Amino acid sequence: MAKDTFLNLRNQIIYCIYVRNHTPEGTFKAIIPDLQRIKGLGADIIWFMPIHPIGETKRKGVEGSPYAIKDYRAVNPAYGTMDDFKALAAAIHDLGMKVMIDVVYNHTSPDSQLVEQHPEWFYRRPNGEMGNKVGEWYDIVDLDYSHPELWDYQIETLKQWATIVDGFRCDVASLVPVEFWVRARKEVAEVKAGVVWLAESVHPSFLRMNRDRGNIGYSDSELYEAFDITYLYDVHDFQQAYFWGEISLKNYLDVLLFQDGIYPVNYVKLRFLENHDHPRIRSKIDDIGRLRNWTVFAYFQKGTLLLFGGQETATAHLPDLFEKDPIAWTGEEDLTPLLQRLQRFKREAAVREGSYDLKAASESETVIGQYRFGNERLTGIFCLDGKAAKVAVDLPDGVYRNQLDDQEYQISEGLLETRSVPILFKSYGEALLTEV
């Protein structure tokens, strides 16, 4: 984490919007009527996937990838005007939320404004042609940060956007010099204090591949010099391995706790079950009870929580990144009541500053998690396989109320019957507390 990172980011929820597919209209204006609902889900920050004009050369699909940007300082005319975006940002601010935009500084579209004006700022293949270092990204060309003038231009762009927005989610931040990000953070702070910096840090395997090819690649530890939050991709492969039965629950939880020992004491991770690069969690989980357990477990983990637009409907369909594919807001299940209860838990001081532990039950796929802060305890019990189990819980015997559904549970001789639903208890020392 950067030295001035605010720990309260661990209490916060980011809601991600892809403007093209959030509404049938696919415009900035069409989002405004939905803001109150999003606020009700507990969103503190709304992150907009790239809002800029999209290149036409080598475009993927009909509409193109929003990550193949033509002009960093303009907005996509299909979404509206700059004034429309400013009005949207103002409406978000009026509701007490912050605005975050995507910053895609590793590359541009092949027909970008910078390609036309400054071709010398781009990576060249051995044959002298512009290109990219990741073959499947054929609709983009990589920037070359050995040019100081490029740094100046990019930082000036960020400073301009900082007059409108409150945060930056930086795409494949690991592939851009960390020294650039450090300088950018410092200079942007002179325009607006408290800007939130989120790094899309990458999977270790992708990092190794780039380093093996002689390209730069920065780890999460290095990125924390400039960023407040990094992605959970350092443990994502383990999450997937557990999900598909390749490793034990204990192995997975050990890796999650390993983060607590290798990062600074006030590190912040972005916790999520899905995003635009990965399948919807519902496409992997048919059982809604199991889905609820995984959802609550994601909220419980230490860090900022990401909700990907539409996740609240428990839909299995991931909107197409390259085409018009609006979210169907009438999903199979409305998770809104659950998410509304979870936001109250997420605000707890113990989640921000307490000690944190995760244990695997001995004979079931159940997680027992606990935060301790002073004499306060927040205990979570999650049946990741969706099955009821009897588990040992480190709490005094007695009756506890589940903060998620107000049902009472008896702990007797240190054991509890889970009933297969996610559970959150709050207690103070030996005294039990039945309401948040």
Regions found by a protein language model. Name each.
Residues 19-23, 52, 76, 105, ...:
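Short, flexible loop/turn elements at secondary-structure junctions
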Residues 47-60, 102-111, 171-177, 200-204, ...:
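Short, solvent-exposed turn/loop segments enriched in Gly/Ser/Thr/Pro and often Arg
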Residues 171-264, 269, 297, 316-350, ...:
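Active-site-proximal helices and loops of the catalytic beta/alpha 8
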Residues 1-47, 53, 86, 90-91, ...:
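Carbohydrate-interacting/catalytic domains
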